[in-house]
Amino acid sequence: MPCGGASGGADRGAKYPKTGLAPTPMPRAFKIPQSVLVVIHTRALEVLLIKRADAPDFWQSVTGSKEHTQDGYRQTAVREVLEETGIDCGPGTTLGDGLLDWRLENVYDIYPRWRHRYDAGVTRNTEHLFGLVVPGDIPVRLNPAEHTAYRWLPWRDAAAACFSPSNAEAILMLPRMMCPGEPP
């Protein structure tokens, strides 16, 4: 018999037998105000932008917070890229060497609409920047709970399409990060 009994699933209205009370949900953990921004691009400087599900006019690069304070930024970048695009750039993969730590951070005010996700009093986030070079024909598989569409744009157009100023600034740095010392 499958877990959850003959119905194949748990009874959502289940109560504890002795008290008659419904189980108390686990408290929701607050987001850690340390995140990554990963600019995914081709060698031709075409940039992948993804459209947020919770803010339909917001186009962005891959972003996401650390799940645990001890997580490294690279570990967070690999996880977020895989979760949001289906692209695996973990150690030992063909794209693993393409994930470059730009060794830059942005500190910015968290948008008021998202502050409820953080502990009381947290208003600023530190964002660590990465670039990921990929082949132009790489398949993209979005997580529909987070993003609803994607598009590839030339780097300047991608920067202009971003809702986040820090994301736009990161994309505008892309030519310098790919070819240090050369003007864009």
Predicted regions mapped to residue ranges:
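Conserved Nudix-box catalytic region and its N-terminal flanking loop in Nudix hydrolases
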Residues: 42-90, 96-97
